[in-house]
Regions:
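Short, small/polar residue-rich loop motifs at catalytic or cofactor-binding pockets
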Residues: 276, 397-400, 464-466
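Internal maturation/activation junctions in enzymes
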Residues: 311-418, 570
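Bacterial N-terminal signal peptides
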Residues: 6-16
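Active-site rim segments in enzyme catalytic domains, especially the processed small/beta chain
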Residues: 62-69, 75-87, 258-265, 411-475, ...
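Noncatalytic scaffold domains of N-terminal-nucleophile
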Residues: 19-37, 41, 47-50, 54-236, ...
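Extended C-terminal subregions enriched in glycine
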Residues: 459-461, 494, 503-550
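Glycine-rich phosphate/pyrophosphate-binding beta-alpha loops
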Residues: 290-299, 400-404, 414-426, 484-491
């Protein structure tokens, strides 16, 4: 029976310890303090881990609108104490009328990303509300309506603007009103472009600017339209999002815009369903690692990187060794090459998941890695069961959010949620930002005359880097869970955190805070402001091309210790962890 305790009658005071906390009973962590508090409120009211995760997703819709929300989608892993690991795919879908030519210009060439992401055509059918409803049905203890209370209070009563929200408003405000804009990650801009001017996105400007000026950290924002919608969905169930007035508002937003109007229909919304998929699992140094199946590339790519590194003694090398980071960089680029060629929505393309994580295949790929010299060229391999594919890498903008809830019974809900780039498509419906997830498809439908696996197709879910992950010890007990935000860096952030925790024995807080190595078309990128840039000369001596830069990172994790679970947000973020 659903627990009917009033949410206002908290059984214990909120205990906030930043950036990590030890568990008394349940533990929650997210990238925003108000969302973390929402999760704790639900746990204190008798809610389950899944209930708390749903409440955090809803609260993040309000207070972290640049990163995620009900206008987007997500993936949830749920581990029942002494029970099965299950997953829910709430990834957005392309409208039924979408074709592979969606992002091809009049000249027959794929649009530049800066032109493709704003407006209606980039919006996928949102999945988070269906995901939330399925999670509450399967694992919930509280009634559906109760999960909305914290988010409704924030939307109607107001919330203070954080540094990341202010930065995103500053970066995107020129686009809303015309002129040039920086496409921002969680903490800043990553690329710049210019579009047609003249108040292109007035609804976003109305919500997230003041008198034409960007939001300022510390000022108070309310969102009564979103509060009203949340009340409606809370009272009437998930269909209130996918049908009726909200469906009309959403369809109007994406079809009536003068910026790339969409072909999405009310039927597309009404037909959307979240999907349960079997998890994808593998092993690393005796530990079991589990994550999402496609259309997430999380489990396959993370397991490939870890598998290629398993023959190297990373523990002996240590976190301060340039050789260790060289090896990680090599495995990363080989695994990402496979990702770009083979991964996509398995409802539309054959993805050789088993072959990609096959031990023999991974050993073959690992054999390409030298301890002393960069490979230089990182081509996809041919895993068992693979069909010929066309290689067409696609850009992802840093964004997204991750959060974790663990309840007193030991159930774990770990979820990554997104609208893709900051403020998604820049379109607003009933106070929530609409995603630009369809730009996660390959903008080029074919290459050298052959179709690309991740091309746009009607009803298809785009490939995703979201990678909620759970690590189990040799006895099968969960000991670590992690996920991240930041576009394609997510996969490397998760892998780095696992290596730091398992090989280098760092606690969750330090594992997340450790610097990151990534790559672009010009070579390796070392995260500035960390210990890694000091390794630039050593890596260059091994044959790498190396630059230093900001990467827009944001992760959350929880680890099991002798005294219970400990939650940790990324020290780069404004996130928190709370305990009961």
């Amino acid at each position: 029976m659903k627990n009917l305790l009033a949410l206002t009658a908290l059984l214990a005071p909120i205990a906030l310890i930043a950036p990590d906390v030890a568990e008394a009973q349940g533990v929650v962590t997210s990238a925003d303090p108000r969302a973390t508090e929402a999760g704790l409120e639900i746990l204190n009211a008798g809610g389950s881990a899944a209930d708390a995760a749903v409440a955090m997703m809803l609260a993040l819709t309000v207070v972290e609108p640049q990163s995620s929300g009900i206008g987007g989608g997500g993936f949830m892993l749920h581990q029942t104490a002494n029970g099965p690991l299950e997953t829910i795919d709430g990834r957005e879908k392309a409208p039924a009328a979408a074709t592979p030519q969606r992002f091809v210009g009049a000249d027959g060439k794929p649009l530049p990303f800066i032109q493709a992401f704003p407006g209606g055509k980039s919006v996928g059918v949102p999945g988070n509300i269906r995901l939330a409803a399925l999670a509450n049905k399967k694992w919930g203890k509280l009634r559906w309506k109760a999960l909305f209370a914290p988010a409704i209070r924030l939307a109607e009563g107001g919330y203070k603007v954080t540094r990341p929200l202010a930065a995103a408003s500053t970066n995107l405000a020129p686009l809303w009103g015309g002129g040039s804009t920086a496409v921002a990650g969680p903490e800043g801009g990553t690329s710049t472009g210019t579009g047609a001017a003249g108040g292109r996105f007035p609804d976003a400007a109305e919500l997230y600017t003041r008198n034409g000026k960007p939001l300022v950290e510390g000022e108070t924002v309310t969102n009564p339209a979103l509060g009203k919608l949340l009340r409606k969905i809370a009272a009437d169930g998930p269909d209130a999002f996918y049908t009726g007035q909200n469906a009309k508002a959403l369809i109007n937003a994406v079809t009536a815009t003068r910026i790339a109007p969409s072909d999405m229909t009310a039927a597309d919304l009404a037909a959307y369903q979240a999907k349960e998929r079997p998890p994808v699992c593998g092993t690393y140094r005796g530990y079991k690692i589990c994550g999402m199946a496609p259309p997430s590339s999380g489990a396959t790519t993370v397991l490939q990187m870890l598998g290629m590194l398993e023959r190297f003694d990373l523990a002996r090398l240590g976190k301060d060794s340039p050789i260790a980071w060289h090896l990680i960089g090599e495995a990363m680029q080989l695994a990402y090459a496979d990702r770009e060629l083979y991964l996509g929505d398995t409802d539309f393309v054959d993805v050789p998941v088993a072959g990609l994580i096959d031990k023999g295949y991974i050993a073959q790929r690992s054999g390409l890695i030298s301890e002393t010299r960069a490979l230089g060229t990182y081509e996809p391999g041919t895993p068992p069961g693979a069909k010929p594919r066309t290689y067409a890498p696609q850009q992802e903008v840093p964004g997204t959010t991750h959060f974790v809830a663990i309840d007193a019974e030991g159930d774990i809900a770990t979820m990554t949620s997104t609208i893709e780039g900051p403020f998604g498509s820049q379109l607003i419906a009933n106070g929530f930002a609409l995603n630009n997830e369809l730009t996660d498809f390959s903008l080029a439908p074919e290459k050298n005359g052959a179709p690309v696996a991740n091309r746009v197709e009607g009803g298809k879910r785009p490939l995703s880097s979201m990678a909620p992950t759970i690590v189990y010890d040799a006895s099968g007990a969960p000991i670590f869970t992690v996920g991240a935000a930041g576009g394609k860096t997510i996969l490397m952030q998760v892998t780095k955190a696992i290596i730091a925790h398992l090989d280098w024995k760092l606690p969750a807080k330090e594992a997340l805070g450790l610097g990151l190595i990534y790559f672009n078309k010009d070579g390796l990128v070392l995260e500035q402001g960390t210990s890694l840039p000091a390794m630039k000369p050593a890596l260059e001596a091994m044959g790498h091309k190396v630059s230093v830069g900001r990467l827009g990172l944001k992760a959350n994790a929880a680890e099991k210790t002798a005294t219970g679970w400990i939650g940790a947000p990324d020290p780069r973020s404004v996130g928190t962890a709370l305990r009961q």
